[in-house]
Amino acid sequence: MNDTVTIRTRKFMTNRLLQRKQMVIDVLHPGKATVPKTEIREKLAKMYKTTPDVIFVFGFRTHFGGGKTTGFGMIYDSLDYAKKNEPKHRLARHGLYEKKKTSRKQRKERKNRMKKVRGTAKANVGAGKKK
């Protein structure tokens, strides 16, 4: 599958403020299925001489008729900057962020406690009970 897949970048921009390089990625894959994001990350890592863990690709859309897919990619200078600037859902896709999930019962109890008070007191109730 790797032999006829071409990756091109355009609208390349170095964003010094967020310590990253950002670009539009065109993937040419005639007669083949859409290329997995992991494979795109690995190929970009080779192109830009970095590791795949600091590369974030998203928003890929395959053009009508297939053969060409376009998306967006960002290469951070380090993993720390990526964790600081990337949205949590994108970090979760890489396994860098785990959302803490409260139980359904706890969420319902909190909601019902919040309904009983009005105004600024909601902040105290929402924080939870002090022990």
From Swiss-Prot:
Record-linked Pfam families: Ribosomal_S24e
Q: Does the keyword Ribonucleoprotein apply?
A: yes
What subcellular locations does the record give? Cytoplasm; Nucleus, Nucleolus
> What is the predominant subcellular site recorded for this chain?
cytoplasm
Note the position of the cross-link Glycyl lysine isopeptide (Lys-Gly) (interchain with G-Cter in SUMO2): 37
The text of the family note is:
Belongs to the eukaryotic ribosomal protein eS24 family.
Q: Function, please?
A: Component of the small ribosomal subunit. The ribosome is a large ribonucleoprotein complex responsible for the synthesis of proteins in the cell. Required for processing of pre-rRNA and maturation of 40S ribosomal subunits. Part of the small subunit (SSU) processome, first precursor of the small eukaryotic ribosomal subunit.
By what name is this protein known?
Small ribosomal subunit protein eS24
